[in-house]
Regions:
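A short, conserved structural fragment
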Residues: 52-62
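Short acidic, hydrophobic short linear motifs in intrinsically disordered regions
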Residues: 22-32
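Short alpha-helical segments that sit at the start of domains
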Residues: 1-21
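Alpha-helix C-capping/helix-to-loop hinge sites
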Residues: 16-17, 35, 54
Length: 98
């Protein structure tokens, strides 16, 4: 997977988890590795900081929590993913079956 695409997925995962609970670098790294991402602590920290700069997360010492802006962004992403998944995850129609 291209790095830019992977980073988008990682950001979405982070917003999802932040919507559920506070995040730490080590917890998030373990979660992401559980999904098959090969990420180091530095990459996780950079993505958390990027989401913080975009006002999607706020830092509280070593923990990060989602902001109102982050919640709204997550809702918008969720809606787009529902549409995308309904299209991408259904078997493609062949030209003959149309």
């Amino acid at each position: 997977m291209r790095a830019d695409v992977q980073n988008l997925f990682i950001g979405i995962h982070m917003l999802y988890f932040a919507h559920e609970r506070k995040l730490t670098v080590s917890d998030m790294q373990a979660e992401l590795e559980g999904y098959g991402y090969r990420v180091g602590e530095r990459e996780v920290k950079q993505e958390l900081e990027r989401l913080t700069q975009e006002n999607y997360l706020t830092a509280h010492g070593d923990e990060y929590s989602i902001t109102g802006t982050g919640i709204e962004a997550f809702k918008a992403i969720h809606a787009k993913l529902q549409v995308l998944c309904s299209e991408v995850l259904t078997p493609a129609q062949t030209a003959a079956s149309r």
